[in-house]
């Protein structure tokens, strides 16, 4: 018993008799309010604990031979699909021929509404054409290439064949109305029909994981003396409006919390024949989910530059939208982890203890203030 008596001396929470305890309405109000606040803070702490936290780490990128997937969704409200060409090139300026892609071009009217329900698949480096029904012609025919014949191409049975032979020779395709194949297929009429239309380009590219660029530009593209050029003879430079809206542009799959800085970017061309350049720094990223799933993707930063590409009015260049990307030698690794239970427990204890302490101070202040006021009132009555 003596030992228990000595143990009681260490009690930090001495109790008073029930008869000496005073319960007030103010104390009840403070208790209810503090209880609700305590519950709210507890739920907030619980929600925070149930979410995962992401730990970033930085490594040297040692991956080799991987492909880079580029997701594209860009609208050109004043550039018809029949005029628009898309090309992908590597850092040396050579066209990437081993590019896997799945790009589509959707015609849009002047209000941005799709002209047809189905988009047409686009081949890199080619503009959109409509080929005449071959069943109505002699399958064994051999039509003229108008002086552009080559060793491997002796016959040009379609307008596209003629354009291809001209492209190979580096000749400008100036007047399609003088080409029988183009007249038959209604090449000029189609260009005229789409004159006031826009175009949406969407899909993806899979290119080699090296620095390079892809671009959207008017005209037929071809290589001339190892230089990538576009034939703009069919277009007046004053009519090339490269206003564009980038709905989405990313390099790889999305992961939780990713920010693609070019998404929903609207750029209005201040004048005709503008060249827009986006200089992109791609950072390889590995995202490891808490369930063990590994997602290999990329994030990027970007800087934009624009200039007039008309040689008569400004700097040399090609009107269009160019995305020039290079890859960082560093890799970011993002790892999802569960939050610490001890941290959650500490937070809960801090909430409970803090609320009890603050509520006790407020209750004591209210109680003693009320007693002091009551004493003054009683003193005034006696005098």
Swiss-Prot record:
Signal peptide: none
Protein's membrane topology: Multi-pass membrane protein
InterPro entries, per the entry: Erv (IPR045888), Erv_C (IPR012936), Erv_N (IPR039542)
GO cellular component: COPII-coated ER to Golgi transport vesicle; endoplasmic reticulum membrane; endoplasmic reticulum-Golgi intermediate compartment membrane; Golgi membrane
Biological processes annotated in GO: endoplasmic reticulum to Golgi vesicle-mediated transport; retrograde vesicle-mediated transport, Golgi to endoplasmic reticulum
Glycosylation sites: 266
Cytoplasmic compartment spans: 1-25, 363-383
Compartments where located: Endoplasmic reticulum-Golgi intermediate compartment membrane; Golgi apparatus, cis-Golgi network membrane; Endoplasmic reticulum membrane
TM region positions: 26-46, 342-362
Site (Ubiquitinated): 8
Keywords assigned: Acetylation, Endoplasmic reticulum, ER-Golgi transport, Glycoprotein, Golgi apparatus, Membrane, Phosphoprotein, Transmembrane, Transmembrane helix, Transport
Translocase found in the keyword field: no
Region: Required for MARCHF2-mediated degradation, residue numbers: 1-25
Residue ranges annotated as Lumenal topological domain: 47-341
Positions of post-translational Phosphoserine modification: 116
Residues modified as N-acetylmethionine: 1
Cysteine pairings via disulfide bonds: none
Subunit structure: Forms homodimers. May form a heteromeric complex composed of ERGIC1, ERGIC2 and ERGIC3. Within the complex, the interaction with ERGIC1 is direct. Interacts with ERGIC1/ERGIC32. Interacts with ERGIC2, the interaction is required for the stable expression of both proteins. Interacts with MARCHF2. Interacts with SERPINA1/alpha1-antitrypsin and HP/haptoglobin.
Family stated for the protein in its record: Belongs to the ERGIC family.
Function per UniProt: Possible role in transport between endoplasmic reticulum and Golgi. Positively regulates trafficking of the secretory proteins alpha1-antitrypsin/SERPINA1 and HP/haptoglobin.
Stated name of the protein: Endoplasmic reticulum-Golgi intermediate compartment protein 3
Species of the source: Pongo abelii (Sumatran orangutan)
Gene behind this protein: ERGIC3
